[in-house]
């Protein structure tokens, strides 16, 4: 564990605004400033809920993000909610449940750190990144053409937490019309990353071409999630030029663990 005052000073130094919708590059920068192997961020709130007429209760929820420093990837996300008659009772139940789950979080971090990363398989075909429209490589290149639109589901956890977020993934599109590797480069938690991956896997497309011949291509796919609105998909060209709008920020101290950092 790191001293809390040192962490706060490091976060202030890099201008961290409390976002829980980070790109892998942003997460790596954050962990470098803190100096850690993993860091935990999250969102927590207590709200009045009603499931039927003349009934109401208090719900306390927490979304826990465990982020790996080296890759900036989301190593684990956990969503927990507790209901009770009063806000204090709901919050106490939530804290107790978080404390009970803390050992599993530590175990997951240890497993992640010790795991042997499997190298990506060698592509049988050459894969091109989408070129900048103004670059010489853009001449004769046509990006993949999508034949359908797949709307990812807005998860129940995101609904409960009223999440507005963006999920980005670098996706390989093969010449045979198959989807290749999907690498999440901006994660959102709350089940939205999995929803985006599932939607990407259902895309149908005509492959990219260069000088009229099919070529494998790697493109950035972006899904914007908002409550009560349909998630929208956008393919970026070039893939890493535009930064999405900042999501709603909400960083809460979820709990103070008493165990050692793995």
Predicted regions located by residue number:
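Hydrophobic beta-strand positions
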Residues: 1, 66-67, 172, 207
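N-terminal segment of the mature soluble domain
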Residues: 1-35, 39-40, 73-76, 105-109
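Short hydrophobic alpha-helix segments
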Residues: 5, 77-81, 183, 218
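N-terminal post-signal-peptidase region of extra-cytosolic proteins
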Residues: 20-29, 45-51, 154
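Soluble non-cytosolic domains of exported or imported proteins
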Residues: 21, 25, 61, 85-96, ...
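C-terminal/domain-edge helix-coil "capping" segments
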Residues: 30-33, 67-131
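Amphipathic beta-strand/beta-sheet edge segments enriched in Tyr/Trp
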Residues: 38-85, 96
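Charge-biased low-complexity segments
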Residues: 88-89, 104-262
């Amino acid at each position: 564990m790191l001293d809390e005052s040192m962490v706060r000073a490091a976060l202030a130094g890099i201008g961290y605004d409390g976002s829980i919708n980070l790109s892998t590059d942003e997460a790596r920068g954050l962990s470098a400033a803190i100096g850690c192997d993993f860091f935990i961020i999250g969102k927590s709130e207590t709200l009045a809920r009603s499931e039927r007429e003349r009934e109401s209760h208090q719900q306390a929820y927490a979304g826990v993000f465990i982020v790996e420093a080296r890759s900036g990837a989301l190593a684990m996300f956990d969503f927990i909610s507790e209901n009770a008659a009063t806000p204090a009772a709901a919050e106490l139940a939530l804290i107790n449940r978080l404390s009970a789950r803390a050992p599993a979080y530590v175990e997951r971090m240890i497993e992640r750190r010790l795991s042997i990363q499997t190298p990506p398989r060698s592509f049988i075909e050459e894969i091109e990144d989408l070129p900048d429209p103004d670059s010489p490589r853009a001449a004769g290149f046509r990006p993949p053409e999508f034949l359908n639109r797949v709307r990812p589901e807005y998860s129940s956890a995101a609904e409960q937490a009223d999440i507005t977020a963006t999920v980005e993934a670098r996706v390989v599109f093969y010449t045979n019309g198959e989807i290749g590797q999907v690498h999440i480069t901006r994660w959102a938690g709350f089940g939205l990353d999995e929803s985006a991956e599932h939607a990407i896997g259902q895309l149908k497309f005509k492959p990219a071409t260069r000088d009229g011949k099919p070529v494998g291509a790697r493109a950035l796919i972006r899904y914007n999630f908002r409550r009560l609105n349909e998630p929208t998909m956008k393919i970026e060209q070039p893939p890493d030029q535009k930064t999405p709008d900042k999501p709603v920020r909400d960083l809460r101290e979820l709990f103070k663990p008493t165990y050692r950092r793995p």
